[in-house]
Amino acid sequence: MPKEQKEVRDLQEGNYVMIEDVPSKITSYSTSKPGKHGSAKARVEGTGVFDGQKRNFTQPVDAKVWVPIVNRKQGQVVSVSGDDMQVMDLETYETITMRIPEDLAPESDDEIEYLEFEGQRKVV
């Protein structure tokens, strides 16, 4: 499993964290001061990398959380058909079928960049 554990205090905006078992990119990170009877708390807000949903959690800053290792890979578009495209990974030469994002109009032989985590892929 490509995940590692980190303390909440080590997280930063722009990094990835598992929120509700979904890899998410941190959009907001804030901490509260320690109180008389408790430790400092951190509020982390993020957006799902693959589904785009907003999620958040609040935990003590010394709590451990899972951080996904999201791989950024290069690929070449082999063919385009409807809403899908076939992409060849430039490292392993494996052919993958992926959805075409709305803001992208790929053509054959275009090179693209995509994110991969535990079998999920998304064109960036």
Swiss-Prot record:
Keyword ATP-binding set for record: no
Task: Keywords in alphabetical order, please.
Answer: Cytoplasm, Hypusine, Initiation factor, Protein biosynthesis
Name the CDD domains on file. S1_aIF5A
What PROSITE patterns has UniProt attached to this entry? IF5A_HYPUSINE
Q: Where in the cell is it found?
A: Cytoplasm
One GO cellular component, as annotated: cytoplasm
Reading the lineage from the top rank, the first entry is Archaea
Annotated region (Disordered), positions in chain? 27-53
Asked whether the keyword Nucleus is assigned, the reply is no
Gene Ontology molecular-function annotations: ribosome binding; RNA binding; translation elongation factor activity; translation initiation factor activity
Q: Name one Pfam family in it.
A: IF5A-like_N
Hypusine: modified positions? 36
* SUPFAM superfamilies associated with the record: Nucleic acid-binding proteins (SSF50249), Translation proteins SH3-like domain (SSF50104)
One GO term (biological process): positive regulation of translational elongation
**UniProt-listed SMART domains:** eIF-5a (SM01376)
- Family of this protein: Belongs to the eIF-5A family.
Role noted for this protein: Functions by promoting the formation of the first peptide bond.
Q: Which PANTHER family match?
A: TRANSLATION INITIATION FACTOR 5A FAMILY MEMBER (PTHR11673)
- Stated name of the protein: Translation initiation factor 5A
Which organism does this record belong to? Natronomonas pharaonis (strain ATCC 35678 / DSM 2160 / CIP 103997 / JCM 8858 / NBRC 14720 / NCIMB 2260 / Gabara) (Halobacterium pharaonis)
